[in-house]
């Protein structure tokens, strides 16, 4: 069964791309009777507030017609930012050699929170080097992953 996030990605990719943006990813956070839908958009030249407003109007129109979420929710549209969330194998692959933190559904090496360097991505498996040790994590075991920004 597809998750609500995967259904939303399928539903919103074309409308967002029609505006010239890339749909970077979606987070749907259920919080009681009111939920949050975060839509991350990206562009090779960056994203500004006007881009977010334009994409928000487009996404809102699609959501009103398709109505995939039956409860109240707040729509947030933004760029992925410097500590960008990672959603796909392609995105993890693009950040090989970068430091990341991942929250897991099931523990790996006794931990659900890992912080290390992405070593490789093979299919749906991520290798992350944590304290000099390579750990292999299935991408579907990652609840949340983010690049750690360097300043």
Swiss-Prot record:
Gene Ontology CC entries for this record: cytosol
Record's keyword terms, sorted: Cytoplasm, Ribosome biogenesis
Compartment(s): Cytoplasm
GO annotation (BP), single: translation
Family: Belongs to the RimP family.
Known function: Required for maturation of 30S ribosomal subunits.
Entry-linked NCBIfam families: PRK00092.1-1
Protein name, entry field: Ribosome maturation factor RimP
Organism of derivation: Shewanella frigidimarina (strain NCIMB 400)
Gene name in the database record: rimP
């Amino acid at each position: 069964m597809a998750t609500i996030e995967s259904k939303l990605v399928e539903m919103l990719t074309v409308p967002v791309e029609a505006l010239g943006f890339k749909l970077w990813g979606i987070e749907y956070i259920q919080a009681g009777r009111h939920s949050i839908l975060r839509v991350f958009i990206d562009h090779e030249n960056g994203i500004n507030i006007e881009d977010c407003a334009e994409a928000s109007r487009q996404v809102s129109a699609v959501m009103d017609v398709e109505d995939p979420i039956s409860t109240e929710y707040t729509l947030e549209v933004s760029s992925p930012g410097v500590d960008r969330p990672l959603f796909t194998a392609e995105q993890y692959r693009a950040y090989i050699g970068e430091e990341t933190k991942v929250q897991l559904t099931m523990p790996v090496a006794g931990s659900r929170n890992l912080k290390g360097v992405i070593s490789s991505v093979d299919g749906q498996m991520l290798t992350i080097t944590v304290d000099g040790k390579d750990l292999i994590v299935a991408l579907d075991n990652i609840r949340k992953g983010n690049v750690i920004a360097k300043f």
